[in-house]
Amino acid sequence: MKRLLLCIVALVFVLAACGNNSSNNKDNQSSSKDKDTLRVGTEGTYAPFTYHNKKDQLTGYDIDVIKAVAKEENLKLKFNETSWDSMFAGLDAGRFDVIANQVGVNKDREKKYKFSEPYTYSSAVLVVRENEKGITSFNDVKGKKLAQTFTSNYGQLAKDKGADITKVDGFNQSMDLLLSKRVDGTFN
């Protein structure tokens, strides 16, 4: 059972991230210098999935999973930290072989990448300052400033709801802007 679970998790990473249908990406992957090293794209700023611990070591659920997969497959790992909006561009350009970061499935990504069954489930929440009275639901964000990454599902949700988007590199930056009152909220 443990081996089956590990194989399923491996498929999540390999199919979801490496399964790009473009021939350019296949060429980039096949020209990788070290076939025993898996180049991993990740944010490194999205706890508890991918972040730095007190010793500044990259850790988190997604990092632990990809390490377990690599151990099982006798692969070395090379982690490449990048912003969310650069994640798929790095994969497409061949800078990464796989993404180990929370990735939501959407129609555009399904057209370009292959996905296995999801291994985590989450839903969007609206994050506002504790004393915020004017924003209590998703429908209240029309015309409000929300800090979002442009290419995330949450960024698309904010656009769909009519929010004024302030571009950020990740969730930590969203929270900094929210706490400093430079934005009204963020979806996450």
Regions found by a protein language model. Give the residues of each.
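Ligand-binding cleft/hinge of the Venus flytrap
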Residues: 50-54, 66-75, 142, 151-171, ...
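Positively charged n-region of N-terminal signal peptides that target proteins for export
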Residues: 1-4, 9
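Short loop->beta-strand "edge-of-pocket" segments that line small-molecule binding or catalytic clefts
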Residues: 38-42, 138-150
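Bacterial signal peptide processing site
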Residues: 19-22
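Short helix-initiation/N-cap motifs at beta->coil->alpha
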Residues: 63-64, 79-90, 133, 151, ...
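Extracytoplasmic small-molecule ligand-binding "clamshell" domains
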Residues: 30-103
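C-terminal motif of bacterial Sec signal peptides marking the signal peptidase cleavage site
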Residues: 14-17
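Acidic, polar ligand-binding/catalytic clefts
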Residues: 76-140
